[in-house]
Amino acid sequence: MPTCTLSLTQQVHGQLQRHLFPGDGKEAAAVLVCTRVPGTRLRLLVRDVIAVPHDKCIRRDAVSLTWPSEYIERAIDLAEPGQLSLILLHSHPGGFAEFSPVDDRSDQEIIPAIFQACGSLHGSAVMLPNGVIFARIYTPNMKMMDVDLVSVVGPDLSFWWNDARSRPISRPMAFTSQMTAELGRLTACVIGVSGTGSIVAEQLCRLGFGRVILIDHDKVETKNLNRILNTTKTDADNTLAKVAVFAGRANQYREHEYVVPVEANVLTRKAVVAAGQADVLFCCVDTLRARSIADLVCKAFLLPLFDVGVAIPTRATTGDGRAIDEATGRIDYVHPAASSLFDRGIYTAANLAAEALAEADPQAHADQVRRGYIDGIPEQAPSVIALNMRAASACVMEFIARGFPFRHDANTRYARTRFMLAEGVEEHEAEDAFHASASPHLARGDEQPLLGLPVLSEGEIE
C-alpha cells in the first residue's frame, strides 16, 4: 500500500497544467501549499497554489529555470501559521520522467532554507506534458522519500504511481486483471455496513481493494439478518458489532487480513481519522448527520465520495390501505471541488436539526411536525435486499466508471443517478445541474478542530 501520497483536485491540476505548459517549450514553476491528513498514513493535500509568473523568471529555457525567491516567501507566509508543507513544482517540457541533476542540486540549496522558516516536511515535484505529476518529500535532515501515488480527484479519477511514471497515461481497462492489480494498491472506506453498505463492502473486497476500512457503531440484530451480508443468527444472538462480523468473514477471503473494522459513530474523531486514510469513500448510511460528515470528509481530505440511498414510498388507497408508490435508489458522486450533498439538497440545516431532535426527544419531534414548525423526516419503508443490491451495484459501478472510464458519454453527465423500478425509469443529472457553493473546508486536512467541528477536537472523548 502507498505510504506517501499527494492529492489535488482536477480543477487545480488543470490550472497548474495551463500555467506550466504555456506553449513556448520552456520550463515553468509553481509552489504548492499542502496540508496533511491526520493519522498514520502520509497524505498531503494541495490547498493553495502560488504560480510563478513566466515574465518574472530570471531564466527560462527547455531544461532549466531560475525564479525569484519572493514567491517561495509568499508560500511560506501561507504555510507558517499551520506549519504546512511546500512542494516546489516545475515542468519538464521535453517529457523527461525523472528528477534531473539540476533538480537535485536545486532541492539541496532551497529546501533547507524552507525548513528554517517552517514545517517538518517539504518537497519537489515535476509535471510532464501529459499531465502526470511525480514528487518526492524531504525530512528536516534532508532524507528523501518518493511520493508513491499522486491522485487527482474530479469527474474522473487519476492515479499516478511513482513506479510507473514513464508509462503511457492511459488508465487500466475496466473489468480486467489490470484494474484488479491497481485496486490492490488502493484503500476504500465504507461508512455504514448495513443494508446497502454490506453489499458495497462485499463488492469492494471481491474486486480486490488492497485495504477496506469499515465504519459503523451498530450491533447485529435479528431484524438485520434479511439484508446484511456475512451475518448469522449467532452474531445477532451475541449482539456482535457489524464491522467486526463482516471483517472476520471477509478476511477469510485472502491469506492476509485487509479489512479494518472501526466500531465507532461516524461523528467521532476515531471514525473521521480512519476515513481519512482511504483513497475513495463510500457512504451507505440512513441518517442525514452521517451524510453531512461524509460530505465534510470529502472536502477536507480531498476524497471522491459515492453516496447511495434507497426508499420505498407508499401511497394511500381506498379503505385506509397502503400501496407501493415506487421502489427507488439514488447514487450521488461528489468530488471536492464540485457541489456537495448539501448543495444538492440531500440534507438541509432544518432537517439535520429535525433529525437531532428526533434522536434526543422523539415525542417533541412528533409534536413539532404536527404543529408544522419543522419539516418532518420522511419515514423510510423497510428495505429489501433485492433493492439494496440494485443500488449497491450501481454505486460501485459508478466508482469503476470514474476510475476506469468505459462510458460513451463524459462522466460529468452522471453526478446523480436515480432509478425508479415501479416506473421502469433511470434518470441522470449532470454536474452543472447543481450549484457548487464555496467551501471553507476544502483541503483543510488536519487543521483543528477536525472538519471545523469542536466535537472532533483533539482530546475529545470518542
Locate the predicted segments by residue.
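A short helix->loop->beta-strand "cap" motif at the edges of active sites that frequently abuts
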Residues: 120-122, 255-257, 301-303
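S-adenosyl-L-methionine
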Residues: 253-269
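N-terminal charged helix/coil linker that caps or initiates catalytic domains
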Residues: 140-188, 414, 454-458
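Glycine-rich adenosine-cofactor-binding loop
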Residues: 176-219
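Internal hydrophobic alpha-helix adjacent to the cofactor/substrate pocket in enzyme cavities
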Residues: 389-408
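Glycine-rich phosphate-binding loop and adjoining beta1-alpha1-beta2 segment
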Residues: 214-254
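E1/E1-like adenylate-forming module used to activate ubiquitin-like modifiers
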Residues: 267, 272, 277-390, 407, ...
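Conserved beta-strand-loop surface patch within small alpha/beta domains used
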Residues: 1-87, 93-157
